Amino acid sequence: MGKKTKRTADSSSSEDEEEYVVEKVLDRRVVKGQVEYLLKWKGFSEEHNTWEPEKNLDCPELISEFMKKYKKMKEGENNKPREKSESNKRKSNFSNSADDIKSKKKREQSNDIARGFERGLEPEKIIGATDSCGDLMFLMKWKDTDEADLVLAKEANVKCPQIVIAFYEERLTWHAYPEDAENKEKETAKS
């Protein structure tokens, strides 16, 4: 189910903001360090799809659902052989409709968009963690920018282990049990 999000109305009063319902999150990109999502708006055709900054959105379930699919797609790309079969090549040469060309350009652009560590930014700290995508993911804050990306914990463990350790240390709690305190007092009294 879509959620409402603010989007400026195309009216003469630029201060008015209306709320529209997001039907689906279609893609993700980072522009100048800011995460944006390509949205399909409920009740509007695909030609009205827009890129919206993450901070303007109020649809965490749809974003989470998209990230699950995105992660699976990324893993699939890494496991796919690079060569295409001859039949696939022929098939793609015959599909030249405007829609096919548009969707091909969108796919090419989305594949070129760097995400997470691919952006080449230096990690500053981990803001939070989630397993909503099936694997443990960290919300990584980058140095010299206000932006953050979800990154695989496995990747963060290798690329910035000290930041991962600091994240866990900040959340580490010790539980003292009354019997432990009594035993320590007895040992101290004996010495």
Curated annotation (Swiss-Prot):
Outcome after substituting residue 165 to E: No effect on interaction with POGZ. Abolishes interaction with TRIM28, CHAF1A and NIPBL. Abolishes interaction with NSL1
GO biological process, one term: negative regulation of DNA-templated transcription
Subcellular location: Nucleus; Chromosome; Chromosome, Centromere
InterPro entries per UniProt: Chromo-like_dom_sf (IPR016197), Chromo/chromo_shadow_dom (IPR000953), Chromo_dom_subgr (IPR017984), Chromo_domain (IPR023780), Chromo_shadow_dom (IPR008251), Chromodomain_CS (IPR023779), Heterochromatin_chromo-domain (IPR051219)
This protein's name: Chromobox protein homolog 5
Functional description taken from the UniProt entry: Component of heterochromatin that recognizes and binds histone H3 tails methylated at 'Lys-9' (H3K9me), leading to epigenetic repression. In contrast, it is excluded from chromatin when 'Tyr-41' of histone H3 is phosphorylated (H3Y41ph). May contribute to the association of heterochromatin with the inner nuclear membrane by interactions with the lamin-B receptor (LBR). Involved in the formation of kinetochore through interaction with the MIS12 complex subunit NSL1. Required for the formation of the inner centromere.
Phosphoserine found at: 11-14, 92, 95, 97
Naturally occurring in which organism (per UniProt): Homo sapiens (Human)
GO MF term (any one): protein-macromolecule adaptor activity
Processing and modification events after translation: Phosphorylation of HP1 and LBR may be responsible for some of the alterations in chromatin organization and nuclear structure which occur at various times during the cell cycle. Phosphorylated during interphase and possibly hyper-phosphorylated during mitosis.
Outcome, altering residue 174 to A: Abolishes interaction with TRIM28, CHAF1A, NIPBL and HP1BP3, fails to localize to centromeres in mitosis. Abolishes interaction with NSL1
One protein family per Pfam: Chromo_shadow
